[in-house]
């Protein structure tokens, strides 16, 4: 019996989740990718295979305001707030949340809560 690394476990969970999650133009998928040093969020229309809007800790809008580490929960809150504002500006209110195989805890949860508080429904 072989054991899977953490990355392989995350990829396995993500494949399992993606069988049931799909985004449309009216209700796109809010996909979250978490690396060791940054966090990324995209709104994806799976039918058209296009990204409607995105935000990350690498955005110029956030880099100037983030004085601390970009891998913190505070940075995730800022990304969640920014992606929600960009979605609402495009007229998107409802999304399907895709945690990307990560556990719903810590930075992923902080991003989701901030997006909800900014007006996205999921």
Curated annotation (Swiss-Prot):
Per the record, its GO cellular-component terms are: cytosolic large ribosomal subunit
- GO BP annotations, alphabetical order: translation
- Does the keyword section mention Ribosomal protein? yes
Entry annotated with the keyword Amino-acid biosynthesis = no
Composition bias of kind Basic residues appears in 9-21
Q: Pfam families of this UniProt entry?
A: Ribosomal_L18p
Keywords (alphabetical) are: Ribonucleoprotein, Ribosomal protein, RNA-binding, rRNA-binding
Task: Please give one Gene Ontology molecular function term for this protein.
Answer: structural constituent of ribosome
User: Which parts of the sequence are annotated with region: Disordered?
Assistant: 1-25
Q: Which InterPro entries match?
A: Ribosomal_uL18_bac-type, Ribosomal_uL18_bac/euk
Against HAMAP family, the record matches this protein to:
Ribosomal_uL18_B
Q: Record's family?
A: Belongs to the universal ribosomal protein uL18 family.
User: What is the annotated role of this protein in its UniProt record?
Assistant: This is one of the proteins that bind and probably mediate the attachment of the 5S RNA into the large ribosomal subunit, where it forms part of the central protuberance.
The protein's assembly and partners: Part of the 50S ribosomal subunit; part of the 5S rRNA/L5/L18/L25 subcomplex. Contacts the 5S and 23S rRNAs.
| Identification of the protein by name | Large ribosomal subunit protein uL18
Upper taxonomic lineage:
Bacteria, Bacillati, Cyanobacteriota, Cyanophyceae, Synechococcales
